[in-house]
């Protein structure tokens, strides 16, 4: 099955890193190749522009893909946003030159030219406001167009605001919040491969900021140790074959580790081992 990934842009690198983290690794390195086999035998990657991915998934020829929420809305495609992947966050904003003195969308003059590649979103947004503007379709960078006198405002994604600042622009309205999403064709939402991918991605996210801690505890100190040891549900406790010693392990938040280790040690724990967790699947 084909899984579409961005061929360029700010979503490309984090998408590939996420897939590698869940075990989907390309088995070919030719940058010219558009379809790549992966370490999951039943999954091939297809590289595509992020704005095209919703259409590819809607067609049914591509089972799923990673693209931005903004591109999904712009396309109007019938796809399911199965997961928010928590990267590529930004705001789709209306921005104007600082020198214009305009502070809100309501202050835009009638017929103002708004440059954007999100044409459908722009039409819908301004129509809902009852604002008459002229939407100028642009496929490349839009930030320079007000300087050239080609547009009075732009509608584009803002991540940090630095690019707008460099071009003398300031945001005056937020149209929507966006981030990377795993999108799936409606007929494949209950497919075992989809469930597998969603489970592994959720497991990867759940493991972030978590550590596995192992420790040995004399029987006489077990109650004291368990009283200070946090756990997702309850710590696992196993009696060792020799001696009156118990092995205890638990999943804990990384940020509590420095204080926790000292508390456990003072309570009587020994042989404390802390390890990373790749995935946490519940």
Swiss-Prot record:
Belongs to the ATP phosphoribosyltransferase family. Long subfamily. It is found in: Cytoplasm. Feedback inhibited by histidine. Pathway: Amino-acid biosynthesis; L-histidine biosynthesis; L-histidine from 5-phospho-alpha-D-ribose 1-diphosphate: step 1/9. It comes from Pyrobaculum neutrophilum (strain DSM 2338 / JCM 9278 / NBRC 100436 / V24Sta) (Thermoproteus neutrophilus). It holds the Pfam family HisG_C. This is ATP phosphoribosyltransferase. Its EC number is 2.4.2.17. The keyword Transit peptide does not apply.
């Amino acid at each position: 099955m084909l899984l579409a990934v961005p061929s360029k842009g700010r979503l490309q690198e984090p998408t590939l890193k996420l897939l590698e983290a869940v075990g989907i690794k390309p088995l070919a390195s030719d940058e010219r190749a558009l379809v790549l086999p992966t370490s999951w035998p039943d999954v091939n990657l297809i590289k595509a522009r992020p704005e095209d991915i919703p259409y590819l998934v809607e067609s049914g020829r591509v089972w799923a893909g990673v693209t931005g929420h903004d591109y999904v809305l712009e396309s109007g495609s019938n796809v399911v946003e199965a997961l928010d992947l928590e990267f590529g966050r930004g705001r789709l904003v209306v921005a104007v030159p600082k020198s214009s003195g305009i502070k809100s969308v309501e202050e835009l003059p009638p017929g103002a030219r708004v440059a954007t590649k999100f044409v459908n979103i722009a039409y819908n947004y301004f129509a809902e406001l009852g604002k008459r503007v002229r939407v100028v379709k642009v496929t490349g960078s839009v930030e320079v167009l007000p300087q050239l006198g080609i547009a009075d405002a732009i509608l584009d994604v803002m991540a940090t605001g630095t690019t707008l600042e460099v071009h003398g622009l300031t945001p005056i309205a937020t149209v929507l919040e966006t981030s990377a999403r795993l999108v799936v064709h409606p007929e494949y939402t209950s497919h075992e491969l989809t469930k597998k991918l969603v489970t592994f991605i959720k497991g990867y996210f759940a493991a972030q900021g978590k550590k596995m801690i192992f420790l040995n505890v004399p029987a006489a100190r077990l109650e004291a140790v368990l009283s200070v040891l946090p756990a997702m549900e309850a710590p696992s406790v196993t009696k060792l074959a020799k001696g009156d010693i118990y092995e205890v392990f638990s999943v804990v938040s990384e940020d509590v580790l420095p204080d926790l280790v000292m508390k456990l040690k003072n309570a009587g724990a020994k042989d404390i081992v802390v390890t990373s967790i790749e995935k946490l699947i519940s």
